[in-house]
Amino acid sequence: NQGLMEQNTALVIDMDKCIHCDNCSDACAAVHDGHSLLTRHGPQLDTTTANIQFPTSCHHCDDPLCLTGCNFNAMERTPTGEIRIIEETCTGCNLCAKLCPYDTIAMVPRQSETKAGWIDRLLGREPEPVFVPTSPTGKKYKRLAMQCDLCVERPHMNCVYNCPTGAIFRVKPSDYFVGVESIS
């Protein structure tokens, strides 16, 4: 079952409602520096009553190999159970991505050292500095690990909120799929 039933929370797309507009993926990228952390591919459950897809996104596992394997303390579990990458200490070494059995961690280029949002540009403001960690030798780390953070610092999950048909939602698999025997 590719770990679907063991995860704390699963992103689910009702394929009977999905119109393949990519709003979910675009909305994710809009709040994650242009990087969508959602891939609309994954296992499907197709029965007479449901046509459900499980897009690739972080499982926020009970026993996360990425978290326990990180040598730089760049990952933590939040008080509400989500796995979070700490950008300030992430070296971009790729170990967490290699350890993730579900391939849900992406290695992305770090932002430049300044970041100007569109409102800043519109108002003619100076870009705000972005912290870029460096190695003990002064080398700047060029990559950053990213995974679905459930938009915990936002009032809603952007992918879910921006779906025009309500096709995408999060569930606790052990409750939602009681009695389901196989997911292909």
Mark where each language-model region is.
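Iron-sulfur cluster-binding cysteine motifs and their immediate structural context
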Residues: D22-H41, D63-T89, L95-E113, R125-K139, ...
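Intrinsically disordered, low-complexity segments enriched in small/polar residues
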Residues: W118-L123
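Flexible inter-domain linker/hinge segments
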Residues: N1-N8
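Solvent-exposed, charged amphipathic helical/linker segments at domain boundaries
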Residues: R143-M146
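Extended hydrophobic/aromatic segments used for targeting, binding, or gating
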Residues: T48-T56, D62
